């Protein structure tokens, strides 16, 4: 049977995107070619950032690659992001073909694409392909670690009180089940230094502490923790580290080996701009044998040594979403990981300044320091309930944010400076 996947419209979308990038005002900018390998990608020069990060003509072009109506502004990257047109169409067309042909022969391509996705994701985050597995989301990845680590009664786990429930309540349930001790630490809301963010974790540590588990970036305050410094200090004390990267994968230019964490979890449907039901589970190679598998299905082997084969054999699942992971990563690399981080940081910093100027009565939950924050901006308006403002922003102004920890706004590369003006105008109107 003829393979039509390579001839579908998503590929045309990618070609069109590349032509647009190379056209007009962007002709002088060195741009990676979509579809090239990651090794080739790293050999090509990066964009000149002084010409790109603030080049609104370019980012307006990027915005057009997403299926967001002109009357809506999406500011909920911390929860869910749209995918580019061609990713949506690739998933849809693959699902359609699967429904037409569920044979083992047709489905063999999913295993091939999964292998490619693992290789590309490993390079994307600076690890070995044997150290990562594809799961369905961050929650599942966290759960596999919480339930898989062979801790004993009396062993201690230290968690941040701003962790996601899958990295907090899950530990508390584990404590009730077999007697581990969970210590929860609170960090200062307005830290003056990195040391103030680290000290509470290590002040709580004892000789029985086995793991420190924390969100890289909090979804309820926007605070970014010094992951590399925490991981290094923990390693020096023979303490494992789990970094929940739900808010950093796809937003930050990551290298997990450089970060030094023992475990890292994330999803692709947030900042990575990928399809639903994809997550990653990373662990340092020497930690693979520390975990018991939580789920065992057909194809699992006790002799498996890779993370994907030992811990991520989860039974029948929707394989059309991992099928689009390589293209998702290619899209990111075509723009540049550092360029994306710089752009998001620029947008969030700009948003903070505009709020301070136009809505001076607003109070910031998120630290103003760029060293202690990233892409998430959370504020409160005096006398206003965040849930009420959140609803009116959407219903009256067409702005989609969130009400987690306050009024949460998280811009991404599909947002522009003109979007930020509309947002701050709306906040000023609602603050009255």
Give the ranges of each region predicted by the language model.
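Pyridoxal 5′-phosphate
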Residues: 2-432
């Amino acid at each position: 049977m003829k393979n039509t996947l390579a001839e579908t419209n998503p590929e045309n979308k990618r070609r069109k995107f590349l032509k647009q990038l190379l056209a007009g005002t962007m002709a002088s900018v060195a741009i990676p070619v979509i579809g090239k390998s990651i090794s080739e990608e790293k050999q090509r020069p990066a964009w000149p950032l002084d010409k790109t990060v603030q080049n609104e003509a370019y980012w307006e072009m990027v915005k057009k690659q997403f299926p967001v109506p002109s009357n809506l502004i999406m500011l909920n990257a911390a929860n869910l992001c749209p995918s580019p047109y061609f990713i949506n169409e690739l998933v849809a067309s693959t699902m359609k073909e699967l429904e037409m042909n569920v044979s083992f022969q047709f489905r063999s391509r999913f295993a091939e694409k999964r292998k490619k996705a693992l290789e590309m994701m490993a390079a994307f985050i600076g690890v070995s392909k044997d150290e990562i597995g594809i799961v369905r989301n961050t929650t599942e990845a966290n759960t596999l670690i919480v339930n898989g680590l062979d801790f004993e009664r009396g062993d201690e786990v230290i968690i941040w009180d701003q962790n996601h429930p899958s990295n907090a309540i899950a530990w508390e349930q584990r404590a009730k089940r077999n007697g581990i001790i969970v210590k929860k630490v609170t960090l200062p809301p307005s830290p003056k230094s990195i040391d103030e963010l680290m000290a509470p974790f290590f002040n709580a540590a004892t000789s029985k502490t086995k793991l420190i588990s924390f969100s890289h970036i909090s979804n309820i305050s926007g605070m970014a923790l010094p992951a590399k410094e925490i991981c290094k200090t923990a390693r020096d004390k023979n303490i494992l580290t789990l970094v929940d990267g739900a808010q950093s994968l796809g937003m930050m230019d990551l290298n997990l080996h450089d970060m030094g964490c023992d475990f890292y979890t994330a999803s692709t449907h947030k900042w990575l701009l990928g399809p639903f039901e994809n997550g990653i589970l990373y662990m340092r190679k020497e930690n693979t044998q520390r975990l018991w598998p939580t789920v065992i299905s057909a194809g699992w082997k006790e002799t498996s040594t890779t993370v994907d084969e030992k811990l991520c054999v989860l039974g029948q699942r929707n394989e059309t979403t991992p099928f689009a992971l390589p293209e998702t990563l290619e899209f990111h690399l075509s723009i540049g990981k550092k360029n994306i981080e710089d752009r998001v940081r620029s947008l969030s910093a700009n948003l903070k300044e505009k709020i301070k100027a136009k809505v001076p009565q607003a109070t910031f939950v998120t630290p103003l320091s760029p060293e202690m924050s990233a892409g998430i901006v959370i504020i409160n308006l005096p006398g206003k309930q965040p849930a009420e403002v959140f609803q009116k922003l959407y219903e009256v102004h067409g702005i989609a944010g969130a009400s987690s920890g306050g009024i949460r706004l998280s811009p991404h590369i599909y947002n522009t400076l003109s979007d930020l003006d509309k947002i701050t105008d709306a906040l000023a109107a609602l603050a009255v």
